[in-house]
Amino acid sequence: MAAGAVAWLLLWAAWLVGRLAADFSDAPFSAGKGVRATCSEIILRQEFLKDGFHRDLLIKVKFGESIEDLQTCRLLIKHYIPPGLFVDPYELASLRERNLTEAVMLSESFNIEAPNYLSNESAVLIYARQDAQCIDCFQAFLPVHYRYHRPHKKDGDTLIVVNNPDLLMYCDQEFPILKCWAQSEVAAPCALKSEEICQWKSMQYKSILKNLTVQVPVGLTIHTSLVCSVTLLITILCSTLILLAVFKYGHFSL
C-alpha cells in the first residue's frame, strides 16, 4: 500500500516537472510574438513659422521604424484650412513652378478677399517630401494668411484652431508594416501632375498637439467711430492735395 502511494507521488512529481519545463520553454516564444505584434507609431507634428499675418504651416511626419523598405511609397497630406485662414492659389502655383512645394487646392470657388464670416473651410492636398536630415521623416510646408475678422467688443484677439490633417500613403508594393497603420482607402491623384487616380491608404498616427491654435489680432468696436472719422479726414485731405496739385501743375487746353 505504501509502495503504491509512493509510486503515485513520483508519477505526479514527474508530470509537474514536465509541465513546468514546457511552460518555461514556451514563454520566450510567446513574448517574442507579443513584441512582433506591437506596431510602431507614426508621429505627426505641425507648427507655424514666421510672425504677422503671413505664416508658413510646417508639417513633419516621423515613422516609428526605418522606412528603407518604403522608398517606393509616397506620402500625401490632406489638410483642411479653417475659415479664419486662407491659402493663395496663385502663390501655390508660383511655388510649384520653382519646385518649392507640391500643393494644390481642392476648393474650386474660392475668394481670397472674403472676410472670415463670409468664408468656408477649404481643402488642400500636399505631396510631402522626404526630409534630408531624417531618414525616417517626411515634411511639407504650406503658406497661409489671416483673413479679416469682425471687430470684438472687449478682447482684441481671436483664436483660430487648425485641426490635424488626414495622412495618406501609397506604395507600389505591399509591406506588412502598412497593415499596422492603414485604416481605410481614399481615392486621390497618384502625383501632383498626374490625372491617374490611386487608392491611397488612410494612415493612423499620433499627433504631438491635439490641435494647432493661433491668435489673430482684431479691432475693437469701441474704436469704430474714431477709425471712421480718421479715415474720412485722411481721404478728404488727400483728395484736396491731389486737386490742388492738378490745378497748379496741370496743363489744360480748351
From Swiss-Prot:
It is found in: Endoplasmic reticulum membrane. The keyword Aminoacyl-tRNA synthetase does not apply. Keywords: Endoplasmic reticulum, Glycoprotein, GPI-anchor biosynthesis, Membrane, Signal, Transmembrane, Transmembrane helix. The chain crosses the membrane at residues 227-247. Pathway: Glycolipid biosynthesis; glycosylphosphatidylinositol-anchor biosynthesis. Residues 248-254 are cytoplasmic. GO terms for cellular component: endoplasmic reticulum membrane. Glycans are attached at residue 211. Pfam families: PIG-X (PF08320). GO terms for biological process: GPI anchor biosynthetic process. It comes from the Eukaryota. It is a single-pass type I membrane protein. Residues 1-22 form the signal peptide. Residues 23-226 are lumenal. Its main location: endoplasmic reticulum. Part of the glycosylphosphatidylinositol-mannosyltransferase I complex that is composed of PIGM and PIGX. Interacts with PIGM; PIGX stabilizes PIGM. Stabilizing subunit of the glycosylphosphatidylinositol-mannosyltransferase I complex which catalyzes the transfer of the first mannose, via an alpha-1,4 bond from a dolichol-phosphate-mannose (Dol-P-Man) to the glucosaminyl acyl phosphatidylinositol (GlcN-(acyl)PI) intermediate to generate alpha-D-Man-(1->4)-alpha-D-GlcN-(1->6)-(1-radyl,2-acyl-sn-glycero-3-phospho)-2-acyl-inositol and participates in the sixth step of the glycosylphosphatidylinositol-anchor biosynthesis. Probably acts by stabilizing the mannosyltransferase PIGM. Belongs to the PIGX family. This is GPI alpha-1,4-mannosyltransferase I, stabilizing subunit. It comes from Mus musculus (Mouse). The gene is Pigx.
